[in-house]
């Protein structure tokens, strides 16, 4: 069977632009269509997206694409969380072992860099302000509207990759097919992006070697460092309720809210009121669907296939891992897309569902449990067990610092939750958890 030499990518976001690099390196003629204007010319504005945390899966993908060195220059290591109590007390919680860290990267900056890298390949062509209006499911064609002129044109498309996000036009076409399963779920919480600018002397106003979290039970504030010495902050808060966005209408409301719940931030955020007014309040969606492919010639990747909430820092990493796995299958099946695509779609969907569930669970951990003494004790015991039993890997480390399939990490999370339910119920465990024979017995029994 003759394999296509040209491919269409719908969506020039993070996953689409990275996948264009992978395909270009293999010699394909790649056409990338994007609904939005070229962000390199239009300029990138924040306010809609959350700073990203690059971890092992993401780094592996950019390494395989040959672009790690270019992208690592502005990535800032965060070896742990810095917890901010209402009293102003700070507690540092390492993410993993010595030397392990996640990396703060700007979504816009990363997307700009990937576009630049992809555009250097002579066999990659970008078409901006082109909206996908129809995907022919019977014949290899796709139709785009030029949003500047209003003209539509049909493009031959023997191979289509839908990387056009949570509200994917390519997926929408597949949703019309028989037995296509699709669910979407919105959190009751929204988010708003805020800023801590550099200090007057040009330095950071807080420790840049941490992801800062202000956990407040049903809501939280987080802050990630940027290379320009600022922090990108994100407030996660219910849309409605006693403490919610609906009650933050005036400058006085916002100031009183921050003074009550995040008092140590007021001096750090001179543009708080301006940011709060000007930046949108955005929603948080989870998307699950199956199958991710159609007739071995149309494939969904990234958020188009598996949009998740951001609380495990894995949305981008999962999308980049899609590229890694697909590229490996290209080698395994000798470039035969009739085998690559169905194999990928069948193998990967369980991982998409699993990281969606893990991200939901981590939301509860970040906003609430991180301030709970029992949870902090669990973290200490888990780190100790990992040191004593190297095969015991905390689930966070499994997800963040390894390439363990997400569905395996989810099973391990269930197992470790059962294990720690027993350990934390042991009498006097708070004072006697190191070298405790009962803990060892439970570990041996559970494992």
Predicted feature locations:
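Glycine-rich FAD pyrophosphate-binding loop
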Residues: 24-47
């Amino acid at each position: 069977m003759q394999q296509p030499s040209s491919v269409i990518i719908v969506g020039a976001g993070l996953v689409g632009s990275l996948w264009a690099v992978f395909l270009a390196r293999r010699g394909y003629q790649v056409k990338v269509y994007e609904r939005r204007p070229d962000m390199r010319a239009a300029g990138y504005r924040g306010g809609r997206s959350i700073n990203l945390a690059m971890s092992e899966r993401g780094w592996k993908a950019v390494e395989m694409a040959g672009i790690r060195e270019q992208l690592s220059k502005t990535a800032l290591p965060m070896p742990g969380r810095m917890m901010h109590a209402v009293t102003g007390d700070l507690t540092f919680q390492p993410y993993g072992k010595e030397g392990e860290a996640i990396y703060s990267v700007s979504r816009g900056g990363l997307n700009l860099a990937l576009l630049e890298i992809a555009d250097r390949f002579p066999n990659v062509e970008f078409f901006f302000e082109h909206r996908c209006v129809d995907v022919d499911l019977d014949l290899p064609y796709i139709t785009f509207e030029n949003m500047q002129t209003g003209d539509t044109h049909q493009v031959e498309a023997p191979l289509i990759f839908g990387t056009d996000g949570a509200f994917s036009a390519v997926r929408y076409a597949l949703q019309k097919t028989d037995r296509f399963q699709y669910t979407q779920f919105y959190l009751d919480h929204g988010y708003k992006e805020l800023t801590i600018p550099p200090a007057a002397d040009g330095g950071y106003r807080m420790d840049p070697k941490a992801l800062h979290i202000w956990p407040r039970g049903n809501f939280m504030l987080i802050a990630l460092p940027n290379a320009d010495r600022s922090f990108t902050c994100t407030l996660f808060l219910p849309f409605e309720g006693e403490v919610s966005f609906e009650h933050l209408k005036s400058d006085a409301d916002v100031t009183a809210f921050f003074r009550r719940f995040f008092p140590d931030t007021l001096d750090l955020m001179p543009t708080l009121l301006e940011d709060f007014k000007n930046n949108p309040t955005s929603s948080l969606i989870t998307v699950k669907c199956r199958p991710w492919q159609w007739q071995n010639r149309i494939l969904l990747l990234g958020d188009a296939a598996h949009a998740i909430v951001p609380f495990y820092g894995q949305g981008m990493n999962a999308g980049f891992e899609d590229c890694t796995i697909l590229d490996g299958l290209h080698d395994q099946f000798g470039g035969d897309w009739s085998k690559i695509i169905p194999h990928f779609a069948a193998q990967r969907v369980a991982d998409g569902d699993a990281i969606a569930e893990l991200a939901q669970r981590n939301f509860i951990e970040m906003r609430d449990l991180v301030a709970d003494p029992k949870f902090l004790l669990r973290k200490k015991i888990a780190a100790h067990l990992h040191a004593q039993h190297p095969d015991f890997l905390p689930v966070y480390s499994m997800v963040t610092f390894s390439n363990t399939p997400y569905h395996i990490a989810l099973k391990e999370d269930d197992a470790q939750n059962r294990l720690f339910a027993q350990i934390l119920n042991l009498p006097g465990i708070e004072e006697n958890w190191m070298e405790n024979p009962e803990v060892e017995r439970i570990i041996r029994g559970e494992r």
